[in-house]
């Protein structure tokens, strides 16, 4: 869906509609809280780009476009918990300067449709993601999905 706006000079502006975009401020607060408790980088994205990020490295990922591979995994409703050297590890961003040591990716589902993802990332070699990080992401994704209904 598209949103149609006009600017002051009367020009028409077309903008792709993002249901998560409506929750950007709220998603930002949720990402802040989750990043603080989990101790990692948290990104909340729609099906195109990051709409909220918090934690160490947030400035590098804010508003970055997600990779086609990630879009495909989300469309298939796949959750991912992977270490950087594992086969199931995927690059999260289209233009990703570095690989992360760990990633946890959970799709956000609203009224039966995938509308985005909650992504937890870590660059810390000493840290190990477990089912706990996956459950934290699932909790956030479930909550955000319900907020958009």
Region annotations inferred by a language model:
Residues 4-6, 43-44:
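Short beta-strand
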Residues 102-109:
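A short, aliphatic-rich beta-strand micro-motif
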Residues 6-17:
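Short, basic amphipathic alpha-helical segments that act as recognition/interaction helices
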Residues 53, 116-117:
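Short glycine-/small-residue motifs
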Residues 21-33, 64-72, 117-149:
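Juxtadomain coupling helices with adjacent low-complexity linkers
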Residues 29-97:
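Structured interaction and signal-relay segments at domain junctions
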């Amino acid at each position: 869906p598209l949103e149609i706006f006009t600017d002051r000079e009367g020009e028409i502006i077309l903008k792709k509609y993002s249901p998560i975009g409506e929750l950007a401020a709220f998603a930002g607060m949720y990402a802040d809280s989750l990043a603080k408790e989990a101790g990692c980088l948290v990104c909340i994205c729609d099906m195109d780009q990051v709409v909220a990020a918090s934690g160490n490295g947030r400035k590098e990922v804010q508003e970055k476009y997600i990779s086609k591979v990630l879009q495909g995994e989300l469309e298939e409703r796949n959750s991912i918990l992977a270490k950087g050297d594992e086969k199931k590890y995927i690059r999260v961003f289209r233009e990703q300067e570095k690989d992360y040591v760990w990633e946890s990716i959970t799709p956000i589902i609203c009224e039966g449709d995938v509308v985005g993802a909650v992504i937890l990332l870590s660059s810390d070699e000493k840290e190990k993601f477990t089912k706990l990080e996956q459950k934290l992401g699932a909790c956030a994704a479930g909550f955000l999905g319900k907020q958009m209904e």
